[in-house]
């Protein structure tokens, strides 16, 4: 068996022969990471990515200075979508080791689920995986209902049914209730709503290959909110939370939805489809209607919703939208505590009115006159939140997935956002 490469930490600079900007050096005992006190977690993550790039697949984190955050930073950079990596963790106290183990179980589940090929992960499989994860952490407190296919149409989940009907794999709504109180009449503290588009071709507004090749990851919002609920439970969440996952393929067929179709929702709103590639908001609307009906204190929806958010923030930040300044501030505080990147983008009352249609109350995409695509998408969603000005957060999760490796991440899913939402739920 190959001996594990020892990885140690030092606050001293590397030997001058390695250069004055060296973040790691190699010696007879292994590899030393040289911390400078400026961005130590980022330095560790970037160094781990380089170590993986050297083909080193077995490491032992040894010596002083390792804690949960530094171990996790190393793993975030070291983990990749191919091959097996083995880490021998340093001695941590029981609480730190439990926290690390929970991250390894749940956030790795999120990353692996998002990375799964669309052929292996359809709408039903995504819903079932979510149920399995949550049952693994709190099965006695979990009940759920899966509604799919024509049952969605019969129960008037018209956004989800319309988008998903073009695929041979039926669309699915997962409604999951985490109720640790044991009281079936206990108030619902929070609702989480996730976009679970397991493959997005764009429909008849078809994507080019360069924009379609990563669309197995278009269910990243659903995976992330599922992981967030599971992780919050491991941190002691004792309030009732409901999870709604809106799962579908967006494909082309003789039965697929078309431009000019009008979707009539249960809350009385109707929306004209002028871009079948703006499908995420159409399925989320059904989940938000259900979430609002619970009258929770907090609604969070999460979706890989717009290219506009990526244009603004790249893959480096999740975009946050809210009319509730206090709640947005709480989310950003949670993000800072968890060392996760969120950035608030504008959402104003006028964005709700920038989706004009000649034939319906709403258009599912903005016109050239209203180019703030991420904000108008959030404005669209607000029409399906009963009290949209208070207690609602929309996260356009641009940092969910990377098509290519960068200095701190392998290609694929990042798992970012799980800890922040869990932090907010348990604050």
Swiss-Prot record:
Its EC number is 3.4.11.23. Mn(2+) 1 binds at residues 200, 277, 279. It catalyses: Release of an N-terminal amino acid, Xaa, from a peptide or arylamide. Xaa is preferably Glu or Asp but may be other amino acids, including Leu, Met, His, Cys and Gln. Keywords: Aminopeptidase, Cytoplasm, Hydrolase, Manganese, Metal-binding, Protease. GO terms for cellular component: cytoplasm. Pfam families: DUF3663 (PF12404), Peptidase_M17 (PF00883). It is found in: Cytoplasm. Transmembrane segments: none annotated. It comes from the Bacteria. One of its GO terms (biological process) is proteolysis. InterPro entries: Leucine_aapep/pepB, M17_PepB-like_N, Pept_M17_PepB, Peptidase_M17_C. Binds 2 manganese ions per subunit. The active site is at residues 207, 281. The keyword Cytoplasm applies. It is an enzyme of class 3 (hydrolase). Its cofactor is Mn(2+). CDD domains: Peptidase_M17 (cd00433). The keyword Ubl conjugation does not apply. GO terms for molecular function: manganese ion binding; metalloaminopeptidase activity. NCBIfam families: PRK05015.1 (NF003450). Homohexamer. Probably plays an important role in intracellular peptide degradation. Belongs to the peptidase M17 family. This is Peptidase B. It comes from Salmonella choleraesuis (strain SC-B67). The lineage of its organism: Bacteria, Pseudomonadati, Pseudomonadota, Gammaproteobacteria, Enterobacterales.
